[in-house]
């Protein structure tokens, strides 16, 4: 990965976290290790409906459009 890719992923994760903060009132623990992202402590089922749509590596870092 080059530096530009890391910046894009960083910005994506920032938007990702802010996006969840708006739709989820419970506290989420997001831990990133390697290429896997583990999210725990969320009781909102909306999280699990949206999560598959937000996988950056499956969609070429494209943000979801509502």
Swiss-Prot record:
It comes from the Viruses. GO terms for biological process: transport of virus in host, cell to cell. Pfam families: TGBp3 (PF02495). InterPro entries: TGBp3 (IPR003411). Residues 1-2 are lumenal. The keyword Repeat does not apply. Residues 24-66 are cytoplasmic. Keywords: Host endoplasmic reticulum, Host membrane, Membrane, Transmembrane, Transmembrane helix, Transport, Viral movement protein. Signal peptide: none annotated. The chain crosses the membrane at residues 3-23. GO terms for cellular component: host cell endoplasmic reticulum membrane; membrane. Belongs to the Tymovirales TGBp3 protein family. Plays a role in viral cell-to-cell propagation, by facilitating genome transport to neighboring plant cells through plasmosdesmata. May induce the formation of granular vesicles derived from the Endoplasmic reticulum, which align on actin filaments. TGBp1, TGBp2 and TGBp3 seem to act together for cell-to-cell propagation. TGBp1 is the main movement protein that physically cross the plasmodesma with the viral genome. TGBp2 and TGBp3 would facilitate TGBp1 function. This is Movement protein TGBp3. It comes from White clover mosaic virus (strain M) (WCMV).
């Amino acid at each position: 990965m080059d530096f530009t890719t890391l910046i894009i992923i960083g910005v994506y994760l920032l938007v990702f976290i802010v996006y969840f903060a708006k739709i989820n009132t419970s506290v989420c623990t997001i831990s990133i290790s390697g290429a896997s992202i583990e999210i725990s402590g969320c009781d909102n089922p909306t999280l699990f409906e949206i999560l598959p749509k937000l996988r950056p590596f499956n969609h070429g870092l494209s943000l979801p459009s509502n």
